[in-house]
Amino acid sequence: MKTMFEKIWEDHLVGELDAGSYLIYIDRHLIHEVTSPQAFEGLKLAGRKVRRPEATFATMDHNVSTRTRDLSLADPVSAIQMQTLKKNCDENGIRVYDFQNPDQGIIHVIAPEMGLTHPGMTIVCGDSHTSTHGAFGALAFGIGTSEVEHVLATQTLVQKRAKTMEIRVDGKLSDKVTAKDIILAIIGKIGTAGATGYVIEYRGSAIQALSMEARMTICNMSIEAGARAGLIAPDETTFNYIQGKDFSPKGVEWDLAVKKWKHYVTDEGAKFDRTVILHADEIAPMVTWGTSPSQVVSIKGVVPDPKDANDPVEKIGIESALKYMDLKSGQKIEDISINKVFIGSCTNSRIEDLRAAAATVKGKKVSSKVQAIVVPGSGRVKRQAEQEGLDKIFTAAGFEWRNPGCSMCLAMNDDVLEPGDRCASTSNRNFEGRQGKGGRTHLVGPEMAAAAAIEGHFVDIRNWK
């Protein structure tokens, strides 16, 4: 009896190098402009070529401006990184979706929507949120620049074998409770180091009921729980999403692929090293209050008191977060005012996210105290949203409608918070300075962010009108 992780691992195992270290084969290598330049330079210096350019795909996302596609207006360092990626890809025969390509977008949005992500694959990228692709039953994880070079040169990677963790979420979610709330509740329960050394498999009826886009949200934040990767077993929802995409198998190959993919599920009776259980009906809309994704409470909660900490380390963490976030213990989450809203990122920038946010703000107006932006995850998402009129709903409400990119998720482009700004964000990290020096980030789902933009503070989306 084997877990899904064990099946994928064994199918890609090249050999054991020494005690605890293994060489595994990589099926798909995704690259972007920030973590690849030094890797390509290393290849040149060593006189090596890219081993499998056809298995490598690139896009520009981290540094891309969502305001303009005029590279002359970009930050000089960002412009150099984007130009370098294009040059490196052209020289090595790698397909690149640059900032002028209509299908450009965040790497973890465009790869699945193009059918590049399949069950049973190994997928790596020089980006920690590569775990997103685990929603398809692929073993996907982030790697460092030296490892990017190794994969480019050999199509293999040296790894230690992870332990297995089962996270079960059974039952039915309450209305307006989303995948973002599930993963924040999980991180709140086990902590940001709770899954260190593990690959998580998300299981249970509540997980099986999720759409593919919602599953991607769950797996996206596996890294925030400390995990190496996150997996969800492939099923008909998975197959229906992949079918007909640009790079998905066609005809007879499709039937053979689905037959193979159905193998990548955990066998009944297989043992996990650890199991964590949550009940879906107990999960409420969640809001982070601090500077770690684990510092999270329900919308009906309050900012915690350091005196209630379980240990001295947690106490210091709470005290530090309270100071940085300029909050007081006992303060109601619903009383926290915000002045910025960001709907986007590889966590929540897909069409379902934008539909939910647009439905929330339709016919309403953004608070005069708030600047709110919506950043589609890809050119395809943007075009689909515009075909459905979502852009008009957002702009009529007072939101800014932008071009695709990582945007305000991280302070590496021209979408940044100013010191003292407080942002309701659908992204995945709320560390100090993550969205800009001195900026304060509260992680929420798309509908919660949209409602906060209208009211100027957090509200319970379940009974908000």
Curated annotation (Swiss-Prot):
Superkingdom per UniProt: Bacteria
KW Amino-acid biosynthesis (keyword) present: yes
PROSITE patterns from the UniProt entry: ACONITASE_1, ACONITASE_2
GO molecular function: 3-isopropylmalate dehydratase activity; 4 iron, 4 sulfur cluster binding; metal ion binding
Reactions mediated catalytically: (2R,3S)-3-isopropylmalate = (2S)-2-isopropylmalate
Binding residue positions for [4Fe-4S] cluster: C346, C406, C409
Subunit structure, as described in the record: Heterodimer of LeuC and LeuD.
Family membership: Belongs to the aconitase/IPM isomerase family. LeuC type 1 subfamily.
The protein's role, per its UniProt record: Catalyzes the isomerization between 2-isopropylmalate and 3-isopropylmalate, via the formation of 2-isopropylmaleate.
The protein's name: 3-isopropylmalate dehydratase large subunit
Gene this protein is translated from: leuC
